[in-house]
Amino acid sequence: MQDAAPRLTFTLRDEERLMMKIGVFVPIGNNGWLISTHAPQYMPTFELNKAIVQKAEHYHFDFALSMIKLRGFGGKTEFWDHNLESFTLMAGLAAVTSRIQIYATAATLTLPPAIVARMAATIDSISGGRFGVNLVTGWQKPEYEQMGIWPGDDYFSRRYDYLTEYVQVLRDLWGTGKSDFKGDFFTMNDCRVSPQPSVPMKVICAGQSDAGMAFSAQYADFNFCFGKGVNTPTAFAPTAARMKQAAEQTGRDVGSYVLFMVIADETDDAARAKWEHYKAGADEEALSWLTEQSQKDTRSGTDTNVRQMADPTSAVNINMGTLVGSYASVARMLDEVASVPGAEGVLLTFDDFLSGIETFGERIQPLMQCRAHLPVLTQEVA
């Protein structure tokens, strides 16, 4: 395992930094984010995700996000072969929560923007203004070929042109209830959506390529990026700096939210033993599928999310940043994340979501300087 860099010493700079946002990346697909026969094996269900998000809300997580995946990687673990649908799942979760922000993901090749605008307005009503939309262009070709809607490999180089038109239609419909947008990909003729959302609808994206960041800088409220490495919590800093620079070009403030997996235990050694156990059970067949799919896009550059996902360094959890250690060590590393300019929040996954969120809320979060404004909670959510 790659060891961490020496512990950083830093000072949290201002009040905003003292309130780094925390979100949970809910397991909408089977087995969460560990591609391993040694990891917990489970199917995605509404009841599981309901328990996760209600527990996250209890411990003052700020938001919950679900991805969309339409075809998995196979292998012994049938990784992500079993998935719920994002908008319908998050509509259900909106109805059983009261404070936490809720985000669904739109696979934009599958859903016309006017339909997404209306679905989002509906969940805004269900949630009382707590809903937002994550827009993805689509990178895994077989997801769309199986339905006969893959637009051809030229799409790889035009996908953010497509998404730019898509979000303009959304903004028209949410803002005024009407769109007459005319573009290369979409033509609206007095298209109507009513009722409109009760609050401005947040749009988020996860672009790491230059084109993706340029899109986020112009249209997104914030941008997700991958953490990097194992116990190297600030290694993503160059990515956050690129996003900050791109946003400065548009005169907007678009922060970075960073994806990490937390594997924690009483001691560093106990947590590391779990991590090594998961790696030893890596599902090589599923990982080979991921590597093969990552090579299909030859037009978007070398800095895309999927290229990082397929990197062999930590492929067992698709190369999201990984924080492995005692509760105190993980708290310290998350405070180091908060020290990075442009980092406004983190999106967390866990090897075991229910116990992971509980130990985070009771043992890790109370030790974090960047969450010191929150009360310490020990009572389990019902």
From Swiss-Prot:
CDD domains: Alkanesulfonate_monoxygenase. PANTHER family: ALKANESULFONATE MONOOXYGENASE, ALKANESULFONATE MONOOXYGENASE-RELATED. This is Pyrimidine monooxygenase RutA. It comes from Escherichia coli O55:H7 (strain CB9615 / EPEC). Induction: Up-regulated by the nitrogen regulatory protein C (NtrC also called GlnG) and repressed by RutR. FMN binds at residues 68-69, 134, 143, 159-160, 209. Keywords: Flavoprotein, FMN, Monooxygenase, NADP, Oxidoreductase. Belongs to the NtaA/SnaA/DszA monooxygenase family. RutA subfamily. The FMN-N(5)-oxide reacts spontaneously with NADH to produce FMN. Requires the flavin reductase RutF to regenerate FMN in vivo. NCBIfam families: RutA (TIGR03612). It catalyses: uracil + FMNH2 + NADH + O2 = (Z)-3-ureidoacrylate + FMN + NAD(+) + H2O + H(+); thymine + FMNH2 + NADH + O2 = (Z)-2-methylureidoacrylate + FMN + NAD(+) + H2O + H(+). GO terms for molecular function: alkanesulfonate monooxygenase activity; uracil oxygenase activity. Its EC number is 1.14.99.46.
